[in-house]
Swiss-Prot record:
Gene name of the encoded protein: RPL9
Signal peptide: none
Main localization of the protein described in the UniProt heading: cytoplasm
Description of how the protein assembles with itself and partners: Component of the large ribosomal subunit.
Name assigned to this protein: Large ribosomal subunit protein uL6
PTM annotation (N6-acetyllysine): residues: K121
Taxonomy, superkingdom: Eukaryota
SUPFAM superfamilies assigned: Ribosomal protein L6
Length: 192
C-alpha cells in the first residue's frame, strides 16, 4: 500500500543556520560547518517560515521502506545540529589483565599509536577520521577522549581503535584486553 504524503519537520535552533542546495544540507553553527548529501534518496527538502527555522522532509507516494527514510533524514539533520552546537565526545578505556597497554597520541591528535598490547612488540597505528581529535585524559588513567562535530566520524574513529586491539587466535571470553568505548556524550553540556 502506498501512502500519499508522509512528512516530518526538524526545528532549527537560533544559533544554527541551515542552507539547502538541492538535496544537500549544509549546517553552520558555533563549532563549525557540516554538509551532507541526500541525493540518493528521493525526497523533498524545504525550509519553512520567514526566518527559515524549520526544515521539512516530504515523501510522496512511498511504500513502507521509502517512508522510513523521512525519519532517518530528520535524525541525520538533528545529529548535525547537535554536532555544530554541542559537539560529540566518546571516551574509551584501556582494559588489560597483565601487560599494560601504552597509548601515544601523535600528529596533534590525528594518529594513535598502541604499544605493548598483550606484550607484543608490534606498534598498532590508527589514523583518526578528518575532523576528529584524540587526546589522553588527564583526570582518568588509561582513558582516551575522542572529540569532533560529526557523530559518524567520531564513532567510526572509536570503532577503528577498538578493532585495532582485537585478540586473534585466543578465547575472547578469557582474553578481554583491548580499548573499548566507555562513554558517549557531548563536548558541551546542553542547557536543560
Amino acid at each position: 500500500m502506498k501512502t500519499i504524503l508522509s512528512n516530518q519537520t526538524v526545528d532549527i535552533p537560533e544559533n544554527v543556520d541551515i542552507t539547502l542546495k538541492g538535496r544537500t544540507v549544509i549546517v553552520k553553527g558555533p563549532r563549525g560547518t557540516l554538509r551532507r548529501d541526500f541525493n540518493h534518496i528521493n525526497v523533498e527538502l524545504s525550509l519553512l517560515g520567514k526566518k527559515k527555522k524549520r526544515l521539512r522532509v516530504d515523501k510522496w507516494w512511498g511504500n513502507r521502506k521509502e517512508l522510513a527514510t523521512v525519519r532517518t533524514i530528520c535524525s541525520h539533520v538533528q545529529n548535525m545540529i547537535k554536532g555544530v552546537t554541542l559537539g560529540f565526545r566518546y571516551k574509551m578505556r584501556s582494559v588489560y589483565a597483565h601487560f599494560p597497554i601504552n597509548v601515544v597520541i601523535q600528529e596533534n591528535g590525528s594518529l594513535v599509536e598502541i604499544r605493548n598490547f598483550l606484550g607484543e612488540k608490534y606498534i598498532r597505528r590508527v589514523r583518526m577520521r578528518p575532523g576528529v581529535a584524540c587526546s589522553v585524559s588527564q583526570a582518568q588513567k588509561d582513558e582516551l577522549i575522542l572529540e569532533g562535530n560529526d557523530i559518524e566520524l567520531v564513532s567510526n574513529s572509536a570503532a577503528l581503535i577498538q578493532q585495532a586491539t582485537t585478540v586473534k587466535n585466543k578465547d575472547i571470553r578469557k582474553f578481554l584486553d583491548g580499548i573499548y568505548v566507555s562513554e558517549k556524550g557531548t563536548v558541551q553540556q546542553a542547557d536543560e
